[in-house]
Amino acid sequence: MILKADVKGTGKKGQTVEVADGYARNYLIPRGLAVAASEGALRSIEAERKAQQEKQQRQVAELSALRDRLDGQTIQLRAKCGEGGRLFGSVTNKDVADAIARHIGKPFDRKMVELDAPIKTLGVHLVTLRFGHNITGKVNVEVLPE
């Protein structure tokens, strides 16, 4: 049987497993969790696996290119502040993501911005960006008075 989904105690999606006839006939096949391991099904699973790998490689290439474009750049933000450079409120990862999105001209997910704590002072702050697939970068965020 070729599993079409993860099945606890049996295997993971795409694996070829041997199971009892009754288990396959009464549980796996009716629920759409597995198909019989025929030549066509094996080819189909292999093609699906290759497509998934190619998609992941494209994503890694795109994220690496974005990291190379942003790494070491200075992103400017304007915020209202009071005496001594203290901000009214703070600059959050959403604010940084919005500024990066304006800088690169396309949407940027705030979950990629890693702040230890919200920024509460004017000046330049080093911010880590986590793109996924173990790709990280750093960007300087310069907070200027509004």
UniProtKB/Swiss-Prot annotation:
One of the record's GO molecular function terms: structural constituent of ribosome
GO cellular component: ribonucleoprotein complex; ribosome
Keyword Repressor: no
PROSITE patterns named among the record's database cross-references: RIBOSOMAL_L9
GO annotation, biological process: translation
Keywords: Ribonucleoprotein, Ribosomal protein, RNA-binding, rRNA-binding
Family matches, as Pfam families: Ribosomal_L9_C, Ribosomal_L9_N
Gene3D superfamilies, sorted: Ribosomal protein L9, C-terminal domain, Ribosomal protein L9, N-terminal domain
Entry-linked NCBIfam families: L9
PANTHER family for the chain: 50S RIBOSOMAL PROTEIN L9
Family note: Belongs to the bacterial ribosomal protein bL9 family.
Biological role: Binds to the 23S rRNA.
Protein name: Large ribosomal subunit protein bL9
Organism: Symbiobacterium thermophilum (strain DSM 24528 / JCM 14929 / IAM 14863 / T)
